[in-house]
Structures are given as structure tokens and as C-alpha cells.
Amino acid sequence: MSTENTLSVADLARENVRNLVPYQSARRLGGNGDVWLNANEFPTAVEFQLTQQTLNRYPECQPKAVIENYAQYAGVKPEQVLVSRGADEGIELVIRAFCEPGKDAILYCPPTYGMYSVSAETIGVERRTVPALENWQLDLQGISDNLDGTKVVFVCSPNNPTGQLINPQDLRTLLELTRGKAIVVADEAYIEFCPQATLTGWLVEYPHLVILRTLSKAFALAGLRCGFTLANEEVINLLLKVIAPYPLSTPVADIAAQALSPQGINAMRDRVAQTVQERQYLVNALQQTACVEHVFDSETNYILARFTASSNVFKSLWDQGIILRDQNKQPSLSGCLRITVGTRQENQRVIDALRAEPV
């Protein structure tokens, strides 16, 4: 048998996958730390007891208790809620449902969350970027100039990694610009830290608005992998066509329903209050630390700061077991590190380590 045209397994893969640089999640980047402040997780574990013992049966595609509890919490109808394996799956579902590979494009505004780009690339959909303005708000003219052929626009508010809210009037302008042309996805992964800024009340006005949510941040359930997509029923029905038949395991659905009970939501709000208090403590301390050039305002559970020698600071803390998130390679974030708000003890360790840095 001739082997002249034999391809390696890698050669058999799609070209865009061979060339793909995967998203560098906090866990992929690794480290041997004992102070993990690089993934915007809640710093302490929350305990739940499993109540469902039907693991011999397949779960519901969209568990009723989870959907109803989340709809009540978010102030929308159950028909406007889809639950998935984290908000990351929601990103992928929207692209798969609305974008033709090789024809349509997505658009996002760096510096922002990296999975919009990676998800589009794996599916073979063009990625367009319109960098944010100097104040990290939307460049509406730039977006308008790039809408031809764009099917989905991703906006993260509060934005990761910068921490600020997108101007609501700019969001309205964007929704008007895209009406009848493109889907606008508002990523609200951190909205529990500034609930007054949610766009859920806008769903009735904008049939092309999609909102992403998660239990990974304020609900302290990053290990659960449970996220939500909020949209009008027509959009949800389209997403249900492309979602896996059993996206949530029975234990995940069980814990999610408990987390979204009245007691669970009250506990989440207590965690938010605790995080906001610790965030202010960390901001004040960073502002009085010599190696810190600037601390940016935050509406989230993390702080972005610019350092005089960020690479040295990052490595020095890494070597001490304090793992931060390096944002140097993001557009306009030269010298910046992102610090998750931890416990008081963790925050103090960060400050002590930073104040020991040479300037």
C-alpha cells in the first residue's frame, strides 16, 4: 500500500484548529501557589448537600427547577432562560446558531474576555476587533463601520479585565445600530456586583439582545460549570436546537437549584457585600504601594492595576505562591496585572509582598 499521500493525525485536523492558540485559562497557566487570585473565583468554598439520587437516569435538558428559580431571580419569564455548561457554552451556542462559517463575522472590543475570539475561531467564523477607546468605552463609529457582514457583537459589562461598566447610552446606541442586522450579546458574568446595571429590562425593547450570566463568580460555584443565557423566546428556541441533549448533569442541576433558592440568593448577596468591602480595602492599600502606578476603578470582584515593573512583580509574587493574572499582552494594558479580591488574609499577603518589591 502506498504511503506517499499519508497524512499525520495533525494534518487531518482543520487548518484553523491546527493554528489555534487555545484560551489560556487560569488553571491551564498553572502555578504552585497557595494564594490564587487569577481567576476571579470566590476565595472560600460553599457547601451543598446533594438531594437527587437518580444518577441512573439521564437528566432533563433544561431542568425545570433551575430554569424557574433563575427566571424569578433575574426578573424574566422561564421561556427567556437557557441553562448551559457555564456562560462559555452560551458564547459558543450563539455563534453556532447565528453565524455561517466562512461568511459571517463576530465583533468584539478589546481589551476584553478572550473566549469570544477562541469560540469563533474554532467554529471557523471571522473575528473582527474594534479596540475600545482610551477610557475603555465603546468606539461606536468603529463598530458602525464594521457591521457589514457582522452577525454577533459581544460586549462585556462590567468588562473583564478592566472592571468598568459600559456606558448604558452607548449600549442603547449599539442596539439601535444593530437592530435587524446583528445579535448583541451582553456578557453580565459580574453583574451581581453592580445589579443596577443589568440589561434584563431591555429584552422587551430589543429582540436581538442576548444576556450571558454565570454562577461562577458571586454565587461561588466556578467548579459547578453552570451559566445562563437570557433572551427573547425566539432566540432561546434557536439555541435549544444546537445545545447538547444533556448539558447539565443531575448533581449540577441539583446544586444550581439550591443556590438559586431564596436562601441561596441571600447568601450570594452577603458574599457580594463582603467582596465589595474587601475590594475597597485592597484598592486603598494598593494606592499606597510604591510599585503601583495606577489602580483602576472596578465594579467587580477584581482590580486592575498598572505597575512600574509588572513582569518582575508578577514573577516575584508567583515565586512566593501568590498567583495573579498578567494582562500585559492585552491591547492598551501594558504594565497591568489583574488581582482577584480574596480573603482579608490573602489580600494582606498581596500587599505585604508588593510593598517589599524594589522600586
UniProtKB/Swiss-Prot annotation:
Domain of life of the native organism: Bacteria
EC number: 2.6.1.9
Keyword Cell inner membrane appears in the UniProt entry: no
UniProt keyword Ribonucleoprotein present: no
GO molecular function, one term: histidinol-phosphate transaminase activity
GO biological process terms, semicolon-separated: L-histidine biosynthetic process
Known cofactor(s): pyridoxal 5'-phosphate
InterPro entries (UniProt xref): Aminotrans_II_pyridoxalP_BS, Aminotransferase_I/II_large, HisP_aminotrans, PyrdxlP-dep_Trfase, PyrdxlP-dep_Trfase_major, PyrdxlP-dep_Trfase_small
Catalytic reaction annotation: L-histidinol phosphate + 2-oxoglutarate = 3-(imidazol-4-yl)-2-oxopropyl phosphate + L-glutamate
Alphabetized SUPFAM superfamilies for the sequence: PLP-dependent transferases
Pathway annotation from the record: Amino-acid biosynthesis; L-histidine biosynthesis; L-histidine from 5-phospho-alpha-D-ribose 1-diphosphate: step 7/9
Homology family: Belongs to the class-II pyridoxal-phosphate-dependent aminotransferase family. Histidinol-phosphate aminotransferase subfamily.
Family matches, as PANTHER family: HISTIDINOL-PHOSPHATE AMINOTRANSFERASE, HISTIDINOL-PHOSPHATE AMINOTRANSFERASE-RELATED
Subunit annotation: Homodimer.
The protein's name: Histidinol-phosphate aminotransferase
Organism, scientific name: Salmonella paratyphi C (strain RKS4594)
Name of the coding gene: hisC
